[in-house]
């Protein structure tokens, strides 16, 4: 089991990143919440990981905060939810916001997260309500991202399941001159939840 990786960030392009640990490059899939706060390529990084092995595949997921990894694991315990939707949850809302939505039973807001319909949202509320208070996001880590924020945000939104035209519109509407990628993505996802 691989629980944590510490190394040099060698590559990042949502949803994938590569960490060089002693000359071995570990490829991980990560939610946008992690990408928001990653350091620049070539810098040291520590990620909490989740190792998943299925009959025909092996996957490694990375998170900057233990609370994100815990939420990722807990969301997958809900009937009918897998890693793809768990990543969409972490990409769409913060851990604290998700806990608030579950505690308050806000089905409408949950259905705005890509891949979550009304029945899935209802199941999530029922199955996670008792554990919602245990979700903790931890302290944020500051990160810097590239200059062409709208273009990079468009690609990231497509990776989250939005159609190319919709992703481009969302990024364009959310972006302002000089914005970082994380800011554009965050604004676009928040606008989609309204």
Curated annotation (Swiss-Prot):
The record, for Gene3D superfamilies, names: 5' to 3' exonuclease, C-terminal subdomain (1.10.150.20), DNA helicase RuvA subunit, C-terminal domain (1.10.8.10), Nucleic acid-binding proteins (2.40.50.140)
Keywords in alphabetical order, please: Cytoplasm, DNA damage, DNA recombination, DNA repair, DNA-binding
- Gene Ontology BP, a term: DNA recombination
Q: Region (Domain III) spans which residues? A: 145-194
Q: Which InterPro entries match?
A: DNA_helicase_Holl-junc_RuvA_I (IPR013849), Hlx-hairpin-Hlx_DNA-bd_motif (IPR003583), NA-bd_OB-fold (IPR012340), RuvA (IPR000085), RuvA_2-like (IPR010994), RuvA_C (IPR011114), RuvA_C_sf (IPR036267)
Subcellular location per the Swiss-Prot or TrEMBL entry: Cytoplasm
CDD domains documented for this protein: UBA_RuvA_C
Signal peptide as annotated in the record: none
Q: Which GO terms describe its cellular component?
A: cytoplasm; Holliday junction helicase complex; Holliday junction resolvase complex
Ranges for region Domain I? 1-64
Q: Where is this region: Flexible linker?
A: 140-144
Q: Which GO-annotated molecular functions does the record name?
A: ATP binding; four-way junction DNA binding; four-way junction helicase activity
Described purpose of this protein according to its UniProt entry: The RuvA-RuvB-RuvC complex processes Holliday junction (HJ) DNA during genetic recombination and DNA repair, while the RuvA-RuvB complex plays an important role in the rescue of blocked DNA replication forks via replication fork reversal (RFR). RuvA specifically binds to HJ cruciform DNA, conferring on it an open structure. The RuvB hexamer acts as an ATP-dependent pump, pulling dsDNA into and through the RuvAB complex. HJ branch migration allows RuvC to scan DNA until it finds its consensus sequence, where it cleaves and resolves the cruciform DNA.
Assembly state and interactors?
Homotetramer. Forms an RuvA(8)-RuvB(12)-Holliday junction (HJ) complex. HJ DNA is sandwiched between 2 RuvA tetramers; dsDNA enters through RuvA and exits via RuvB. An RuvB hexamer assembles on each DNA strand where it exits the tetramer. Each RuvB hexamer is contacted by two RuvA subunits (via domain III) on 2 adjacent RuvB subunits; this complex drives branch migration. In the full resolvosome a probable DNA-RuvA(4)-RuvB(12)-RuvC(2) complex forms which resolves the HJ.
State the family named in the UniProt similarity comment for this chain.
Belongs to the RuvA family.
Its recorded name reads Holliday junction branch migration complex subunit RuvA
Whichever gene encodes this chain, its name is: ruvA
């Amino acid at each position: 089991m691989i629980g944590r990786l510490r190394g040099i960030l060698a590559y990042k392009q949502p949803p994938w990143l590569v960490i060089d640990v002693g000359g071995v490059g570990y490829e991980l899939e990560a939610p946008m919440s992690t990408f928001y706060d990653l350091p620049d390529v070539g810098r040291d990084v520590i990620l909490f990981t989740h190792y998943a092995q299925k009959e025909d595949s092996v996957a490694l997921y990375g998170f900057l905060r233990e609370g994100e990894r815990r939420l990722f694991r807990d969301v997958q315990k809900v009937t009918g939810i897998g890693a793809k939707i768990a990543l969409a949850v972490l990409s769409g809302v913060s851990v604290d916001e998700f806990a608030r939505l579950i505690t308050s039973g806000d089905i409408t807001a949950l259905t705005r997260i890509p891949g979550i319909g009304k029945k899935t949202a209802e199941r999530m509320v029922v199955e996670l309500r008792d554990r919602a208070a245990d979700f903790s996001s931890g302290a944020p880590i500051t990160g810097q991202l590239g200059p062409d924020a709208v273009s990079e945000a468009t690609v990231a939104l497509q990776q989250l399941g939005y159609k190319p035209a919709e992703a481009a519109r969302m990024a364009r509407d959310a972006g302002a001159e000089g914005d970082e990628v994380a800011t554009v993505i965050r604004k676009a996802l928040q606008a989609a939840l309204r």
